[in-house]
Amino acid sequence: PMYLGGQSKETGRVYIYKVGQLLLTSNGTLRADKKPQDSRFGYSLAAVPDLNHDGFNDVVVGAPLEDGHRGAVYVYHGSRGTILPQYQQRIEASSLHPSLSYFGRSVDGQMDLDGDELVDLAVGAQGAAVVLRSRRIVQVNASLAVHPASINVLQKNCPRHGQDSVCVTATVCFRATSRSPGRGDRHFGIEYSVALDDRKFGARAVFDDTSQKLVQKRLRASVGRAACQPLPFHVIDTTDYLRPVSVTVTFALSDSDPGPVLDERSATTVKKLIPFFKDCGEDNECVTDLVLQASMDLAGS
């Protein structure tokens, strides 16, 4: 913890050594905040049971002098045979309570303190102890289905704003799974945005309820069940029939929800392209068959 870094600051450092049969071998260092400051990173250290439920134990490191002696703790995930050097989470004292100081002077995490079958973390500070509750981790798979599968501008199937239009319904579904133990906190909120033709300046399609090409939505989901929502839109008259219309969904778990958190490896964007109907056969591949015939007519010959 007394290691001197840049500008002669007591930044601290944690070295990783691998235990062998005869000796210890160096296996790198743990990376903390790069800002030169008195930190005493490594003042406290705890090996904790698997916090992210990937099958490997993790490490928590305290840095009680960071942020002007307010303090912080770092969470590092374990991997096969080592510890990942880049921290996965930095928890600042200032984000918890304005009066905390020397947060991270001691750390411990071996027990479930709130009865949800997850190991929680206890962190010592000046005149205080803070319990950090673990949260479940969910993997969310988003999918898009579109009906009809292509846009036929010659078959306008619905009236919109006083004129016949081509209407399409995109249905987004979210399916959640979890590798965390126990059954609590299985319900959570999802906030998502849907964009039509997200890279184009002019709108070729808009949503029925807003007449805009971008909408913000939210829904409630639960582990083990699919949560779906229809998104009806219609196509505006356009001269660009070559490039397909894109539907892009970007989502995140609701920040205001105290339930589970999203697995950092989960993709948060799904995109689908809806082509225009070309009437080019079963393979939808149009092959041009243009023939040019020329004749010469010389006047006066």
Language model regions located:
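Conserved beta-strand/short-helix segments
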Residues: 1-301
